[in-house]
Amino acid sequence: IRLHSHLSETVDYLDAARQKFAMTPVQFCAEHDWLGNDVWFAHLVKLLPEEIALLGRTGTGIAHCPQSNGRLGSGIADLLALEQAGVPVSLGVDGAASNEAADMQSEAHAAWLLQRARKGMLAQPRYAGGTFEGGADAATVEDVVRWGSAGGAQILGLAQSGTLQVGMQADLAIYRLDDPRYFGLHDMAIGP
């Protein structure tokens, strides 16, 4: 059985943990043996670099819920830093209290857009010491598809699903893309 909770989503949450336990939520979980490859947390928006490293070393996963985080204004998890540190990344919809749709297709699209916007916010012009243009390379369509499929299977411990290959279990969804809302679609894998 996998362990799951919501963690490090808002500044108020961090302040409350620091006040009550004199540590961050991730540090609290580490102290109570609640990290590991059988644990995954929703959100993980507010993390220190050493927490990202700890989550990676322990193989603790994340369910990124971009629409919920956007609706609540809590921020956007740095999925690329998490993934580079070894954190298994997946996508989630959070719950009805903060996501009206629970639609994984629009969640994947939001993850793609918001990861790019997050990195773009860090871009500076060259005269100010900037070294990159923006966030266009922050998340690819392939990243988002991986997070929404293989990443989800990994954090749930579903070794026989998550990819389309011989011998694996799979469910397929087919969408019509001839609706006017798809006319500007550049990549069918990331359509809203």
PLM features per residue range, with description:
Residues 169-192:
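C-terminal cap of metal-dependent C-N hydrolases
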Residues 31-38, 80-176:
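His/Asp/Glu-enriched, well-ordered alpha-helical/loop segment
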Residues 48, 70, 97, 112, ...:
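Glycine-rich nucleotide phosphate-binding loop and flanking beta-alpha elements
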Residues 9, 66-70, 94-97:
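Short, acidic/turn-prone active-site loops that include or flank metal/cofactor-
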Residues 9, 46, 97, 174, ...:
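Short, glycine/acidic-enriched loop or turn micro-motifs at the edges of active sites
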Residues 71-76, 100-102, 185:
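Short, charged, surface-exposed secondary-structure boundary motifs
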Residues 14-17, 51, 102, 115, ...:
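Short, function-defining helix-loop hinge/capping sites that tune catalysis or transport
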Residues 1-61, 70-89:
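Histidine/acidic residue-rich metal-binding segments in metalloenzymes
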